C-alpha cells in the first residue's frame, strides 16, 4: 500500500506568519489534485500539520523563526484548494499534529503506516528543505520507499529547495516526480 503525507501546507506557511510565498502558491492546484487522486485510489492520506503554542519559549524553533501555526489560529488552517479537498474527504484523511520538523518525530505516523502495511511514502508540501527533508530522512531510516512530488513541494529558499531535491534522489534513493512522471536531477 502507498501513503501520501501532506506536510504543512497551511495559511501561515503559504501567505501568513512564515510565508513561502509565490513558490507555495504556485503548487496549490497540483497539491490538491495529487491529494484528491490518492483519496480516490483508497490510499492512506495524512495531513501532517505543524502546531505551536505561542508561549512555548523552550521549543527549539522559538529562537529560529517568528511565531507560526499557533494552536487555535487561522494560520494553522490548510491553504486554499487543499482545505476544500480536506473538508470534502476528512473522514478518509488522517489529520496529525506535529511539533517538530519531521512528521515522524513524537507522532504515531510510523505506527499508522505499519498498521496499513504501507511500504511506499509519497511526500508533498512545504518547506522542501526543512520539514519535507526531515520527514524523508526519517522515512528512509525506517526503510520506506520514498517518492517526492517535486511539483508539489516548495521553499522560501530556492537554493535549499534544489539542494533538497538532489539530496532526496542521490542520498535517500527517492524517486522524484513531476506530473506523476519520474525525473532525474
Regions found by a protein language model. Name each.
Residues 1-3, 33-41, 66-185:
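Active-site-adjacent betaalpha module
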Residues 4-9:
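N-terminal nucleotide-binding beta1-loop-alpha1 segment
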Residues 10-16:
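Short acidic, Gly/Ser-rich segments with clustered Asp/Glu that frequently serve as metal-coordination loops
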Residues 11, 53, 154:
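Short, glycine/acidic-enriched loop or turn micro-motifs at the edges of active sites
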Residues 17-24, 63-69, 99:
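Short glycine-enriched, charge-decorated loop/helix-capping segments at active-site entrances
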Residues 17-50:
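A short alpha/beta connector and helix-capping loop motif
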Residues 50-52, 100-101:
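Short glycine-enriched loops at secondary-structure junctions
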Residues 56-60:
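Metal-dependent catalytic neighborhoods of phosphoester/phosphodiester hydrolases
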Amino acid at each position: 500500500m502507498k501513503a501520501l503525507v501532506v506536510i504543512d501546507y497551511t495559511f501561515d506557511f503559504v501567505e501568513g506568519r512564515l510565508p513561502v510565498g509565490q513558490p507555495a502558491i504556485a503548487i496549490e492546484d497540483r497539491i490538491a489534485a495529487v491529494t484528491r487522486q490518492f483519496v480516490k485510489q483508497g490510499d492512506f492520506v495524512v495531513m501532517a500539520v505543524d502546531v505551536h503554542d505561542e508561549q512555548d519559549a523552550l521549543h527549539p524553533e522559538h529562537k529560529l523563526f517568528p511565531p507560526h501555526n499557533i494552536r487555535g489560529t487561522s494560520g494553522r488552517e490548510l491553504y486554499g484548494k487543499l482545505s476544500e479537498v480536506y473538508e470534502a474527504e476528512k473522514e478518509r484523511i488522517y489529520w496529525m499534529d506535529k511539533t517538530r520538523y519531521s512528521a515522524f518525530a513524537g507522532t504515531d505516523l510510523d505506527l499508522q503506516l505499519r498498521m496499513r502495511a504501507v511500504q511506499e511514502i509519497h511526500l508533498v508540501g512545504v518547506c522542501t528543505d526543512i520539514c519535507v527533508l526531515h520527514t524523508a530522512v526519517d522515512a528512509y531510516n525506517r526503510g520506506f520507499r520514498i517518492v517526492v512530488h517535486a511539483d508539489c513541494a516548495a521553499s522560501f529558499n530556492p537554493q535549499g529547495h534544489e539542494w533538497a531535491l538532489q539530496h532526496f534522489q542521490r542520498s535517500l534513493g527517492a524517486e522524484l516526480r513531476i506530473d506523476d512522471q519520474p525525473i532525474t536531477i
